[in-house]
Amino acid sequence: MGDIAAAGFSAVQTSPINECLEGEDGGMDLYGNGKWYYHYQPTDFKIGNYQLGTRDEFKAMCDEAHKYGVKVIVDVIANHTTPATDEVSEDLIEAGGGILNPLSQGGRTPLNDFGDRLACTTYEMGGLPDINTERPSFQKYFFNYINDCIACGADGFRYDTAKHIGLSDDPKR
């Protein structure tokens, strides 16, 4: 972190630190089964995954960054889960309304019209099951994750696929 601060940078952004799909062979091979985009396929909203480390390691990194005046921005995904739905935690499934329920009002319908706000916020994007972000139980579950990130030292967030996150005043079916 000292080198980052000395180079004039005031912030770093992490990849998503949530639990995510590992793939085969533990997912450690970035060019094989442990692809970078697995970080964007949450299996739960708890800190820690097989490539970026544990909650304690994240906290230690934040503490080190703050020693040098470097802020930590965390990339977060609130919109969807992994398509490997059998890997998604029961807690997340329950908070999101259930995969077979489905997770969102659009079900497993593929998104084809990116200009349609209802479709953008309720349909699957790229085969990734949409989460019903309008659901209060999911909001509470997700904010518990965000608050844990803050408790560990996160200073800010970048929301991936922000335009696909449904809001309470969005159109309904």
Predicted regions and their residues:
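Substrate-binding/active-site clefts of carbohydrate-active enzymes
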Residues: 1-2, 6-152, 164, 169-173
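Receiver (REC) domain switch/active-site residues of two-component response regulators
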Residues: 155
